[in-house]
Structure formats: C-alpha cells, structure tokens
Amino acid sequence: MFTAFARAFKTPDLRKKLLFTLGIIVIYRLGAHIPAPGVDYSKVQQCIDQADSGGLLGLMQMFSGGALLQITIFALGIMPYITASIILQLLTVVIPRLEALKKEGQSGTAKITQYTRYLTVALAILQGTGLVATARSGALFQNCSVGSQIVADKSIFTTIIMVLTMTAGTPPVMWLGELITDRGIGNGMSIPMFISIAATFPGALWAIKESGKLADGWIEFGTVILIGFVMVALVVFVEQAQRRIPVQLPKRMIGRRSYGGTSTYIPLKVNQAGVIPVIFASSLLYIPALIVQFSNSQAGWATWIQDNFVTGDHPYYIATYFVLIVFFAFFYVAISFNPDEVADNMKKYGGFIPGIRAGRPTAEYLSYVLNRITWPGSLYLGLIALVPTMALAGFGGANQNFPFGGTSILIIVGVGLETVKQIESQLQQRNYEGFLR
C-alpha cells in the first residue's frame, strides 16, 4: 500500500491532484480555528475543557471538526449542506416537480443542486441564529461557570454580525468541496467531513484517558483503541458486502455488427441506507433533551426525560435508539431505491433477471431481496451505533464523547474506501499496481 502511495506521488498529474487536495484541507482547517467576531476565545476554551457534547450537538461538533463549540467562522461546517441534501432527497419522492427534474438528466440534476445550495444558505442562517442565541444565553456549555460570558456584547448588532459571519462561512466550505471534486482526489463534500471527524480523534482519545479510573485511564484508553480497530474491520467488511442480482442484456444487430448479449448485475449493498439512519435517530433523540434544557422545567415529565434520555447508558435510551435506527434504515431504503423504476428501465432496454419475468414480477423480486438484506444491514447499523455507548457504560464513562462512534466510523471508512478506489483507478490507468489487491 505504501509503495503504491509513493508511486501515486511519482505520477505528475496525480501528485498535483493530491497536493491540491491537501492544500484545500489546510485552508479548511485554518478557517475552523478563526473565531467569529464578538466571541471571548479564552472563555470558550475554558468551557470546552468542561463541556459534555452529546446527541445532535456532538454530531454537529464532530462534522465541524471542533469548530462548532469554538464558535469560529466555519463553525457550521458542512452540516447545513448535508441537511439540505437529505431534505431535497426526501422531497424528491413527494413533490412531482422535483421528481420530474431528477429524470431530466444532467440539466435537472443541476437545477436540484442549485435548490440545494439555496436551502443550505437558509439552513445556515437558521443554525447560525440558534448557535449564537444559545451562546448568548450561556446554554451552549452545560455546567460552565463562565458560559454566559462567551459573548460579552449581547447587542442586536453583534448578534447579527456573528450570524452573518457564520452564514458567510458556509458557501466557502461548499466551494472548497467543489474544488476538490473538480481538481483534486475524492468526493469534495465528503473530504471535509472526513478531515473534521479525524481532527477530533486525538483530543477525544486523550480526554477518555484523562477521565479514566483504571490504571490512570490507560485501560479505558486501550479498550477504546481495541474497540475502534474491531469496528473499523467490521465496517469495512460490511460496507463492501453486496448482493449482486444478475441481469441478462439482449443481443442487438446494428448493421452487420452485433451489440449486447452480455451479462451484468445490479449491486444491492447490505448497508444500502449508509449513515443516514444513525443521523436521523441521533437528531430525533436529542429533541426531548433540548426541550428540557431550554424549558428549565422541574415537572415530572422533564425529570423523567432528564433521567432516561439525556445520558446514553440508560436502557430506555439504548432500546429507543436501536429501534429508531432500524426503522429509519427501512424508511430511507424505501425512498432512495425504487424497484418499480429499476424494473421499468430494465424492460425498456430489454434486460431481464434470469428466471424472473420482466415488469411487475421483477419489481416484486427486487423488493423481496432488498427487504431481506436490509434486515441485517439495519441490525448492523444499530450494533455499530450502540457498541461504543455500551462499552463506555461498562467503565462508567457513558457521558464521555466516544471518538469511534458509529457515525464517525461509518463516514471515515466510507470516505476512505471511496478515495482509495479513486486513487486505485488512477494508478491502474497508468499500469501501476494499486492499493487493493
């Protein structure tokens, strides 16, 4: 692998792409450390040392590479774009106009991309306003004595400037991602997520060691590393697993030449839904805790939520989280893969699955296979998401932010595999032996 990587750097055009990607990453990380105007950076650092960021806040903190709680110009990171993309993907299923655009090919896709950018800016304004309002009230950091002093000047003018600064930081992140896609290596919208998550690993690992109680925290530290390696191996194995549905294409005569008559396949991944169900479940479970946090209510319902759904080690939380992941896995697969559309396209070009009639029987067969492989895929997602929480709960540290969580591992492995495959294809074009053997 290292020899292949060295050969990649010896190839002029590939080396140029790799160095360009690294340069964009450096710019992105610099922006993630420039504080927004009106923020007392020393107070922020003091509160970060005492912070417990979990749930949706922890998810956004992870996607921003630690920039969210530091309230920097790139504090929102790529999260508004991810949210906008998911919303547009869901709306495409229920709004006929968007569905028609999707079928128009490249021009329709460009229009949907334009809508996604507009929605990204709107969500950035909304999320930036929420972040600044939370920081002004002192609720951004729990149990921090100077939390209300992070934003010293609480005037409307300062608030507007902070919101505009963080909103203005979102389009450059999208632009940097598009530059990576066009002139670099990898998916430009995935690389910032990859770097942001990887940037949180060293600090999170050391925090686990510092908060550990067994052998000065080294046992907890070693356990987390071991669990991380096992999870990475499991995720790589499952993410590569797929059910291949054989498809036979008919032979066509054009002039005197024969075309087609070959066999291909439809790849159905075991984890067809990707990381989306985990994000949905985390976001939904964080809403009750958010309501309690801002209501400051001492009623019975608020106490029950505080006891059962704020920390991740309670059986109610674990069971609900697992059920939500399984539900959203089936839900997202149902809206992202349309067996009827696939069957119609196959019938249009004369393709068929051996032993299955074209048309409706093909769609029913694809639905049957997809439902069968989604079950193990959804259970796998639930396992990956819950193993870190349950492992840390065993050591009494369930409130500690776990660096090898399900979402982070799925994104790290997925983006890593995609990037390595792209480098592999570039090397094979030049007759070099690549990473994958």
Curated annotation (Swiss-Prot):
Signal peptide: none
Subcellular location: Cell membrane
Keyword Manganese appears in the UniProt entry: no
Membrane-crossing residue ranges in chain numbering: 19-39, 68-88, 121-141, 156-176, 188-208, 218-238, 274-294, 317-337, 378-398, 400-420
Organism superkingdom: Bacteria
Keywords: Cell membrane, Membrane, Protein transport, Translocation, Transmembrane, Transmembrane helix, Transport
GO cellular component entries: plasma membrane
BP GO annotations: intracellular protein transmembrane transport; protein targeting; protein transport by the Sec complex
Protein's membrane topology: Multi-pass membrane protein
SUPFAM superfamilies found in the cross-reference section: Preprotein translocase SecY subunit
UniProt-listed Pfam families: SecY
InterPro entries in the record: SecY (IPR026593), SecY/SEC61-alpha (IPR002208), SecY_CS (IPR030659), SecY_dom_sf (IPR023201)
Database matches in PROSITE patterns: SECY_1, SECY_2
Chain's role: The central subunit of the protein translocation channel SecYEG. Consists of two halves formed by TMs 1-5 and 6-10. These two domains form a lateral gate at the front which open onto the bilayer between TMs 2 and 7, and are clamped together by SecE at the back. The channel is closed by both a pore ring composed of hydrophobic SecY resides and a short helix (helix 2A) on the extracellular side of the membrane which forms a plug. The plug probably moves laterally to allow the channel to open. The ring and the pore may move independently.
Family according to the record: Belongs to the SecY/SEC61-alpha family.
Entry-linked HAMAP family: SecY
Protein name in UniProt: Protein translocase subunit SecY
Source lineage: Bacteria, Bacillati, Actinomycetota, Actinomycetes, Kitasatosporales
Gene name of the encoded protein: secY
